[in-house]
Amino acid sequence: MMNKKSLLLLMMWLCSFALQAQLSPKREFRGAWIQCVNYQFMGLGTAEMQRTLTYQLNELQKCGINAILFQVRPEFDALYASSFEPWSRYLTGQQGTPPSPYWDPLQWMIAQCHARGMELHAWINPYRAKTKGTKELAATHDYRKHPERYFWYGEQLIMDPGMPENRDYICNVVTDILLRYDVDGIHIDDYFYPYPESGLRIPDDQTYARYGNGMNRDDWRRENVNLFIRQLHDCIHAVKPWVKFGVSPFGIYRNLKSDPKRGSNTRGLQNYDDLYADVLKWVKEGWVDYNIPQVYWEIGHSAADYDTLIRWWSEHAGHRPLYIGQDVDRTVAKADPVDPNKHQMERKMALQRSLPNIEGSCQWYAKAVVDNKGNYGTMLRNYYHRYPALQPEMPWIDHKRPKKVRKLTTLWTEDGYMLFWREPRGTSEMNLSLIHI
């Protein structure tokens, strides 16, 4: 019979094992958004931008980041050599002006990320064609060719989501990326129909009259976005079945007041009602491969409590990986509700890893991690991401394990062991062995 001492030791071992598993999960998405709309790259020049990105990627690698979501299409312009759209002003300062000396940031980033064992997801903004800060559109901007496909909303120019030809256009842009670049994912964020502004209404009367087919206008707008998400998903997987399609929606689906059955106990803007984004439907139908809701508030927020929302999303994760979008600035700016001498990172990470359906997180934004605000990067490096993690499994994309490598040998060098092997033969591009160590 097991004595009390042995039982106590066993319980202690099991507890330590469980804690270690929580701190070092085998599979976990550890992403970071690298955005261009904060003007961090504008006018830097080729060499300086490459130095900046190299430093950021090196630091993010030390912090255990295994996926980069790189913004390449902010407003119908491109940080890559697009076949459809002009070079971005966020790169050169003037929309339509190529970088000099010439280079392709997306191609360069893919190579740099893969060399560090990171995935690269090309992040595009599907409908936003011009923001307030853009004063002039290039002659090759799509609005110059087809102004009838767009509407103005305040100082924003939006491609009308209600027109079928607009869905086709965006899918053509994405197909161009897929055919020419070795991206691991296509990512879109929270900009669908525009965020509501006081005194403004969406000017889509003509489009609704033509395509509404008797539907309630709100339902029709949601269906427009649904059709786009489904078409983009099908487009991506038809061209490259292994490329992941992910979305990072606003952090509130619906408030309890609007939907007593599926709403969260919050009081804020809503995906479903205000942005016409039915995120739960996309997950249920399998139209997205992962979901990263932007839960950017703090624990204890009066209208959108982080604790409440992260639990809600975990309960509604469905059958697709759920990652949590984390706001680094807000996390380190807000005190822990129990210990005011600490910020909220520790409590947020503990909560995230304690919930059964959350398989990782994505940091908004990469530079805040690199700048180590509130020792955020240090804590990732030394504690939460101390050991590397594989990406979460997606069996609907690929459920077959790769074949074993052949003729594996080792060689000792002053930098440690080097491994050499012959890769297994693959029958298709999807099954070829590309391994980064």
Where are the language model's segments positioned?
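Substrate-binding cleft of secreted/luminal carbohydrate-active enzymes
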Residues: 279, 287-300, 320-394
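Conserved small/polar residues in nucleotide/adenosyl-binding loops
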Residues: 435-437
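Pro/Thr/Ser/Gly-rich low-complexity, intrinsically disordered linker/stalk tracts
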Residues: 382-428
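Active-site clefts of carbohydrate-active enzymes
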Residues: 247-266, 309, 313-345
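Active-site-adjacent "subsite" loops/lids of carbohydrate-active enzymes
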Residues: 35, 39-44, 127-176, 180, ...
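Catalytic domains of carbohydrate-active enzymes, especially glycoside hydrolases
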Residues: 51-77
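Active-site neighborhood of glycoside hydrolase catalytic domains
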Residues: 173, 180, 185, 192-264, ...
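Aromatic- and acidic-residue-enriched segments that line the glycan-binding/catalytic groove
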Residues: 78-92, 128-153, 191-212, 258-268
